[in-house]
Structure formats: C-alpha cells, structure tokens
C-alpha cells in the first residue's frame, strides 16, 4: 500500500480555513454594529429577550470559530508531523 501526502494541498486547506475564520469574524463584527443600532430602539422585555438571544448567538458563534481554530491547528500540526516523518524515512533510503 502506497501513501502519498500532498503537503501544499494540506497547507492550502489550512489557509482556506483561516480565511473562513477571518470572514466569520468580520461578518460578526458587521452584524454586531447593525444590531447595536437596532437594539437601542427597543425597550422593556423586547430588549431583554433580544439581549438573551444575542448572547446565545455570540456564544455559539464563538464556539464554532474556536472549533475552526482548533481544526486549523490540528491539520497544520499533522501536516508538519507527516512532513518530518516523510523526510526521516527518505533520509534512511538516501543515506
């Protein structure tokens, strides 16, 4: 069985995921700005309900972004480890 690793593709995946993470952050910031303006016009229980939902949304989104960051680190670490292993194996055969 032959295993071949395409390290540039793995790095490309890491870069794509990091880009997604940045886009999520930017969209969240835009969303927050718009919603802050809207929230200022609400009073009473509507404002409280909105605040509760917004906090939950923020927590969930932060969780997703954190998981995405963990995935980026795991893929990056795996690619580095595989590359080091492959270099070590190649050096055994090339002297």
Curated annotation (Swiss-Prot):
InterPro entries per record: ESAT-6-like_sf (IPR036689), T7SS_ESAT-6-like (IPR010310)
SUPFAM superfamilies, per database record: EsxAB dimer-like (SSF140453)
Superkingdom in the source lineage: Bacteria
GO cellular component, one term: extracellular region
This protein's record includes keyword rRNA processing: no
Keywords: Secreted, Virulence
Principal location class: secreted
A Pfam short name: WXG100
Location of the protein in the cell: Secreted
Subunit structure of this chain's protein: Forms a tight 1:1 complex with EsxB.
Function: A secreted protein that might play a role in virulence.
Name of protein: 6 kDa early secretory antigenic target homolog
Lineage: Bacteria, Bacillati, Actinomycetota, Actinomycetes, Mycobacteriales
Gene, per the UniProt record: esxA
């Amino acid at each position: 069985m032959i295993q071949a690793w395409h390290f540039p593709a793995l790095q490309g995946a890491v870069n794509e995921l990091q880009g997604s993470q940045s886009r999520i952050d930017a969209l969240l910031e835009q969303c927050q700005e718009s919603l802050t303006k809207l929230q200022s016009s609400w009073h009473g229980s509507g404002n409280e309900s909105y605040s509760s939902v917004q906090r939950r949304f923020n927590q969930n989104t932060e969780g997703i972004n954190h998981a995405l960051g963990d995935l980026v680190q795991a893929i990056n670490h795996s690619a580095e480890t595989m590359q080091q292993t492959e270099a070590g194996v190649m050096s055994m055969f090339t002297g």
